[in-house]
């Protein structure tokens, strides 16, 4: 990992933490196949570094998980509805679209998401 790539990831993490009033943890001990997660009860995003080969993958995973944070800010009761398959599928579809956008144009996707997080999560506690 180059210093520049690492700096880009750290910058994006900081932007998501500030705009989304959340915490981002970079983990090295996730189970195989888990790229990242959003834990609404802990208001934190986990990025599984051990399951990514580069920072580019971590960045788009961060966008995906930050979209789940945004979804939670838009509808705080979502955490209670996560047992409904249709709700989970809709949430994952929206997050996957954000991830795909990030793969195509990381800067534009990150800027849009940062603005949305500021607007929708601004009054949320950390």
Give the residues covered by each predicted segment:
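Short active-site segment of divalent metal-dependent hydrolases/proteases
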Residues: 63-71
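Glycine-rich short-loop/terminal segments
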Residues: 1-40
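Short pre-active-site segment immediately N-terminal to the catalytic Zn-binding motif
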Residues: 45-62
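Solvent-exposed loop/turn segments at secondary-structure junctions
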Residues: 51-53, 68, 76
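Post-HEXXH active-site segment of zinc metalloproteases
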Residues: 56-60, 72-105
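Long, well-structured alpha-helical subdomains associated
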Residues: 101-126
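Sequence contexts marking disulfide-bonded cysteines in secreted/extracellular proteins
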Residues: 29-31, 47-49, 96, 120-124
